[in-house]
């Protein structure tokens, strides 16, 4: 990179190109300190928050550098002044650098640790896999009893209909077993809306498949030449149909049941019969398949509607209640005498709260709006309640854990005072027993007058903490208790909304909410009064902000108050929710582009890929919100591209007209996000062709080709004259059909899962043979009894333990083996020992072939590896974190003057943070899948990825904290003067750009599987340099301020101000507001205090990000390796 050296001559040559970055450089301003001992000329007479920020941050950065023993690489006095470039601070590699064999050493060490902890892991596995399911079995049965009964009754009725010979013969003859197969695929343990949509989609898909097959049958026997080679026509028809169905199911998951029914009908009708002429066609099989499959769909729908129906309303309200409960648990942990010293327990409660709201509630709400529901609540009111809960949780998410505002002794004393006060008043006691309100909590004016005398041995830190405790501890304690009571009342009100006699409870709910609203606002007001009293007291000073623990207490107070204010909004939204309660049919309202790629939770589990699909969905959502952020103009300033171009051209001229235009320059954004747009060309057709080529070469098409090839290979014997007889006689076409039903493109699995699925299939085959082989060969009563015995354990395995595919395999195999000989017309031969055995082992072998191929197909030819996806996911996650950091730095920290974040900016920030949280959780689920993959070639250490994910989660929390604090202060107002701002521009650019650049490099290394470069910019050193010069400017300002005040001549001060203003105006730059001594008392001290507190919090968060990024870099080097010379 070309760089420019600072000109050291006294009269620089004006012809030397300095680059487009034409501001005064840092080094030239640094020389002014030696040329002018008074420092920089422009001064501010009011105290600046830069002193607190610089002192805290610089001390921490100095300690970090000292602990790491970094040695900075010499920059030889060069400085970068061009736009688009920055000066990176590099440090020499650690003397304990990784050797080329370090990966081998790490792997050997990991292997030794794994061997040493083998017994511990074995005991944990035994506990997880055996003892815990046994202990929790009664609870799981009670919780899922209704679902198990619905699954059981639907399947049992289907078997009973099939074994009754008149009904079974009318429904499907020897293919009647498609009735229970359809029940298994479309089981009734779903919401009514989902079941109805699934039924309609499957009916349309099966009808379309039968129509396609009828056309293929007609064409294949229309003439004698085609009838002689009917297999070729059916082969072509099946290939086209499978290509269409598999690709559509892979791209748009909403068509899962449509394509499944379509494919089943296509595979069945293309392999079940081979005719030599149109007179040999047996169209009866269309009836046999269509009616049995239709009755299975209708039976599942009937059981879903009649037996304990679920409309989706109760599940969503359960998510809301759970969210309120976890928030209450977190607040209770803050004032728990036993947990006050356990930061880990409080942190776990905080993480659970975030997960419940950002993941569980969000997932439940999406499922609710993505399906047909019969709801009692207005959708817009539910959405407002969810958004207000999210806003409340945002402040609690960054709440400092276990600050020194409380200790266990003080909490016990507060609880004793509370109980004593309640016991003294019988009236208040009755009210408290009737409704757990906080009206009995004693309050007093918590002013510093209650502050205890300070002993001579106390440190400054202890003095500050004691002063803050005396002022705020009881008010904060009362506010937390009140928030807990309010959350409990909200949970009670939501339960009353669901009760049948809701109209009678509505007045009571309004009374509870109104009382909670007034009490909470009163506690917030009392906390505000305590704060104002403290600000006006003698204990309030600038030195408080130089203590980190005091800043934590202020942030705790601020974030808690913000969350309490948001809780007031939650109360209002809950009250609005109860004003419009009546039964209504809510159609799906989810955006179509996203609805086509989503399925309800139970349907996703039925697919068999577990939570892996959640990762791809979350990744699409994150990409979508970043695309919206980068292509939406959120500035308060107007932006006109045409006028900007005209101004740029006119600026090249020197006439009077162009000068007038420059005087009326419009305000534009400092950074234009169009560079981040995915559309890199102005030609729309070129972009569309690129998208088409991506689709044709994507994973969906590769999977389609692979599955179609395997299906055609398994179907091939049915079209050959030498093999079609035995293939159709023993229903061997169940091999391709089983393979199609069990294969999934996002399921890698391992040999243990293959064996588990195979064992379940063998159990089903054996049980079906036993049902027919028992006394009175093929007795309908025995078959029904065996069906009832096998469906109970596998329904529990299906619904409780989420082993959906293995349970489906067992029940499908039992259904086919039990009903195939029972349904054949020649009962005298088929229902004998020889007939039952031959039918069992031949058809069972076909089923086993389909089962064995269903999982290893993902291991060969364009395989799906969760480990590869995990590496790609880390690349995307690091890129998204880097872009989030850049967005916070651009739109919050270094925003233009008078360009505060808008409501749209805040909305995008909330959506981005929630979706990144969901993406992190989805990556953790992907890591669980990667742990169970078979190790073939590469070594994989999941603990390294787990450490990297934890570091990324910490980075996200700090980015959120910085975003919240960045909205409350302007960085330009904290500078001493405009020349300080110009001098620090390059250092601020270097500090932020170093972090973004490291994110970019790490992301690309994960995507390309390259090793991490040995030399990367050190953000900590860049940030240390920034605060070093901020401290220097602060010292220069203090020195100049003391020299100016020592003169005692007001005329000299006014003259200095005039000189400064004249200098600023002559330089052609806009002057920053310079507060005078006369009007400095008019500045709102409270606003300035919180501005400074948030500035310190922001600086600390960015310092934490720089430090955590070094840990991320170390984890990345452990995973990918490090380049060596």
From Swiss-Prot:
UniProt region (Disordered), positions on chain: 1-21, 426-449
Subcellular location as annotated: Membrane
Record topology, Cytoplasmic segments: 1-143, 195-198, 249-254, 306-706, 772-780, 865-1125
Subcellular location, principal: membrane
Superkingdom assignment: Eukaryota
Transmembrane segments: 144-164, 177-194, 199-219, 228-248, 255-275, 285-305, 707-727, 751-771, 781-801, 844-864
Basic and acidic residues bias: start-end ranges: 1-10
GO terms (BP aspect): endocytosis; protein transport
InterPro entries: BRE4-related_DUF2421, Brefeldin_A-sensitivity_4, IVT-Associated
A Pfam family this chain is assigned to: BRE4
Its job: May be involved in intracellular vesicle transport.
Additional remarks: Deletion of the gene leads to brefeldin A-sensitivity.
Annotated protein name in UniProt: Protein BRE4
Natural source organism: Saccharomyces cerevisiae (strain ATCC 204508 / S288c) (Baker's yeast)
Name of encoding gene: BRE4
């Amino acid at each position: 990179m070309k760089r420019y050296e600072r000109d050291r001559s006294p009269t620089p040559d004006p012809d030397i190109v300095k680059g487009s970055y034409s501001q005064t450089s840092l080094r030239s301003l640094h020389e002014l300190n030696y040329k002018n001992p008074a420092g920089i000329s422009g001064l501010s007479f009011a105290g600046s928050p830069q002193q607190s920020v610089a002192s805290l941050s610089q001390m921490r950065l100095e300690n970090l550098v000292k602990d790491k023993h970094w040695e900075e690489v010499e920059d030889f006095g060069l400085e970068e002044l061009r736009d688009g470039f920055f000066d990176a601070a590099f440090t020499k590699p650690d003397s304990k650098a990784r050797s080329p064999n370090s990966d081998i050493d790490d792997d050997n060490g990991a292997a030794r640790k794994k061997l040493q902890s083998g017994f511990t892991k074995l005991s944990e596995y035994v506990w997880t896999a055996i003892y815990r399911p046994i202990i929790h079995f009664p609870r799981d049965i009670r919780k899922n009893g209704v679902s198990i009964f619905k699954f059981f009754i639907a399947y049992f009725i289907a078997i009973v209909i099939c074994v009754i010979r008149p009904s079974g013969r009318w429904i499907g003859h020897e293919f009647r077993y498609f009735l229970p197969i359809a029940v298994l695929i479309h089981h009734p343990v779903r919401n009514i809306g989902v079941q109805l949509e699934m039924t309609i989609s499957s009916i349309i898909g099966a009808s379309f498949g039968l129509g396609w097959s009828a056309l293929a049958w007609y064409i294949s026997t229309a003439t004698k030449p085609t009838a002689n080679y009917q297999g070729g026509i059916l082969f072509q028809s099946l290939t086209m149909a499978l290509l269409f169905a598999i690709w559509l199911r892979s791209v748009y998951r909403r068509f899962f049941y449509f394509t499944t029914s379509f494919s089943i009908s296509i595979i069945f009708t293309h392999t079940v019969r081979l005719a030599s002429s149109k007179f040999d066609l047996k169209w009866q099989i269309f009836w046999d398949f269509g009616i049995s499959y239709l009755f299975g769909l209708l039976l599942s729908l009937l059981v879903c509607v009649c037996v304990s129906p679920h409309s989706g309303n109760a599940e969503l309200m359960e998510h809301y209640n759970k969210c309120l409960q976890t928030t209450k648990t977190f607040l209770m942990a803050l004032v728990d005498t036993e947990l006050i010293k356990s930061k880990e327990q409080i942190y776990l409660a905080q993480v659970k709260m975030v997960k419940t709201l950002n993941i569980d509630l969000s997932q439940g709400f999406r499922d609710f709006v993505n399906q047909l529901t019969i709801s009692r609540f207005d959708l817009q009111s539910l959405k407002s309640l969810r958004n207000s809960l999210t806003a409340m949780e945002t402040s609690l998410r960054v709440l400092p854990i276990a600050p020194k505002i409380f200790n266990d002794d003080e909490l016990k004393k507060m609880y004793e005072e509370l109980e004593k006060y309640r016991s003294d008043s019988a009236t208040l006691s009755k009210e408290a027993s009737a409704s757990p309100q906080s009206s009995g909590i004693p309050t007093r004016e918590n002013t510093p007058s209650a502050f205890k005398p300070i002993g001579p041995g106390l440190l400054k830190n202890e003095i500050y903490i004691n002063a803050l405790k005396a002022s705020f501890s009881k008010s904060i304690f009362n506010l937390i208790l009140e928030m807990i009571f309010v959350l409990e009342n909200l949970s009670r009100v939501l339960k009353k909304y669901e009760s049948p006699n809701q109209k009678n409870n509505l007045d009571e709910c309004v009374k509870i909410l109104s009382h909670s609203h007034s009490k909470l606002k009163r506690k917030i007001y009392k906390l505000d009064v305590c704060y104002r009293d403290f600000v006006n007291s003698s204990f309030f000073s600038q030195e408080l902000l130089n203590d980190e623990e005091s800043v934590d207490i202020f942030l705790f107070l601020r974030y808690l108050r913000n969350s309490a204010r948001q809780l007031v909004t939650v109360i209002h939204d809950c009250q609005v929710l109860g004003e419009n309660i009546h039964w209504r049919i809510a159609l799906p309202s989810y955006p179509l582009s996203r609805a086509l790629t989503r399925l309800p939770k139970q349907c996703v589990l039925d697919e068999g890929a577990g939570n892996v699909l959640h990762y791809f969905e979350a990744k699409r959502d994150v990409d979508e919100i970043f695309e919206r952020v980068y292509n939406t103009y959120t500035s308060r300033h107007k932006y006109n591209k045409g006028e900007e171009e005209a101004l740029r051209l006119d600026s090249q001229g020197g006439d009077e007209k162009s000068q007038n235009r420059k005087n009326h320059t419009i305000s534009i954004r400092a950074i234009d996000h169009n560079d981040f747009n995915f559309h890199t060309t102005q030609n729309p057709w070129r972009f569309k062709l690129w998208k088409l080529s991506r689709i044709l070469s994507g994973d969906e098409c590769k999977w389609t080709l692979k599955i179609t090839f395997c299906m055609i290979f398994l179907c091939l014997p049915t079209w050959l004259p030498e093999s079609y007889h035995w293939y159709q006689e023993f229903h061997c076409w169940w091999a391709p059909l089983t393979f199609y039903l069990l294969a999934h493109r996002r399921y890698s699995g391992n040999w243990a899962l293959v064996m588990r699925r195979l064992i379940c299939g063998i159990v089903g085959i054996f049980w079906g043979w036993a049902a027919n082989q028992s006394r009175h060969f093929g007795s309908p009563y025995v078959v029904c009894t065996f069906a009832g015995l096998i469906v109970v354990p596998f329904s529990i395995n299906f619904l409780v333990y989420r082993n959906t595919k293995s349970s489906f395999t067992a029940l499908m195999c039992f259904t086919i083996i039990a009903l195939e000989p029972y349904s054949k017309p020649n009962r005298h031969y088929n229902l004998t020992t020889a007939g039952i055995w031959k039918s069992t082992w031949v058809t069972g072998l076909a089923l086993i072939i389909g089962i064995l191929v269903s999982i290893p197909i993902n291991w060969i030819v364009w395989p799906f590896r969760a480990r590869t996806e995990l590496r790609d996911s880390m690349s995307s996650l690091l890129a998204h974190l880097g872009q989030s950091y850049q967005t916070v730095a651009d739109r919050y920290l270094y925003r233009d003057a008078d360009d505060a974040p808008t409501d749209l900016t805040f909305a995008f920030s909330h959506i981005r943070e929630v979706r990144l949280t969901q993406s992190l959780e989805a990556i953790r689920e992907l890591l669980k899948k990667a742990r169970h993959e078979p190790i073939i070639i590469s070594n994989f250490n999941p603990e390294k990825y787990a450490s990297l994910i934890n570091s990324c989660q910490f980075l996200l929390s700090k980015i959120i904290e910085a975003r919240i604090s960045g909205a409350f202060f302007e960085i330009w107002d904290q500078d001493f003067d405009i020349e300080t701002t110009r001098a620090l521009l390059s250092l601020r650019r270097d500090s932020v750009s170093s972090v973004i650049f490291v994110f970019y490099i790490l992301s690309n290394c994960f995507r390309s599987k390259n090793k991490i470069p040995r030399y990367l910019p050190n953000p900590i050193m860049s940030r240390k340099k920034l605060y070093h010069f901020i401290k220097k400017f602060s010292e220069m300002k203090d020195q100049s301020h003391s020299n100016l005040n020592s003169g005692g001549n007001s005329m000299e001060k006014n003259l200095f101000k005039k000189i400064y203003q004249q200098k600023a105006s002559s330089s052609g730059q806009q002057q920053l507001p310079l507060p005078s001594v006369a009007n400095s008392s008019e500045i709102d001290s409270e606003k300035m205090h919180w501005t400074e507190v948030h500035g310190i919090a922001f600086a600390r968060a960015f310092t934490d990000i720089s430090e955590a990024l070094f840990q991320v870099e170390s984890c990345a080097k452990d995973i990918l390796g490090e380049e060596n010379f």
